Amino acid sequence: MDKNVTETTISANYGDFLLSAVEKAKDQFSDEEYKTLTADAEKIRAIEEQIAALAPADAAASSAAAQGTAFPQFEGSDLEGNPVDNSLFAGNAFTVVNFWFNGCKPCVEELDDLNALNEKVKAQGGEVVGINTETLDGSQQGIEAAKKLLATKGASYRNIYFASGSEAGKFALNIMAFPTTYVFDRDGNVVGQPLLGGIDKEENLAALQKNIDAALAKDSAK
């Protein structure tokens, strides 16, 4: 896994990262050690959730691209190896882009909701696209883990990756809170404010819908 991806993952959601790491290495610990490490990681995650609840807007603003900012040019692939680039935006009236990573519990919890949203917005000319930061640079370990999580949640919407050192990679790695979801217009420009948190929560879905409606209005006015 790319070093920058690891650093971003840990700083963004350390409790979830620890829980994931402990679970992967559970065979190396005694039952007592496993229970202790899991309990400690859960305490850290609980503290992080309390901190995040105090100032979620500040966390989003610290790494958010402003409205009208264009998504950087890129060439990459989806998780099945099919080539993809910025033309994906032009093919949609709007594109919902969700940034996530494998060890992020809130990210994984909303995967089925994102899949349902993708099915819904198809009729409006929209698409949901996922960008998992652990898959950047074509990391096979990250890709296989992401595909398993998506399959477990019954999610089949497109997920893509590109080089971490590209401008698009820097855009993704600049995000400091996960999950974060943007809406882009047909020209690849940000519409509204990014959404911090999962759309499995009603208020977050309402905020996302507001951005989608704005993108649709903009597209129909052309």
Residue ranges with predicted function:
Residues 183-222:
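Thiol-/selenol-based redox modules, centered on thioredoxin-like
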Residues 91-95, 122-129, 153-158, 186-189:
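Loop/turn elements at helix/coil->beta-strand transitions in domains of secreted/extracellular proteins
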Residues 15-73, 90-92, 144-148:
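N-proximal helix/coil linker or "cap" segments that precede and/or mark the start of modular domains
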Residues 73-95, 120:
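A short beta-strand-turn-helix
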Residues 85-108, 114, 127-132:
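Short active-site neighborhood of thiol/selenol oxidoreductases, capturing the structured segment around
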Residues 144-187, 195:
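Short, internal strand/loop/helix patches
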Residues 101-106, 133-138, 163-168, 177, ...:
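Solvent-exposed loop/turn segments at secondary-structure junctions
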Residues 108-152, 164-169:
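Structural microenvironment flanking redox-active thiols in thiol-disulfide oxidoreductases
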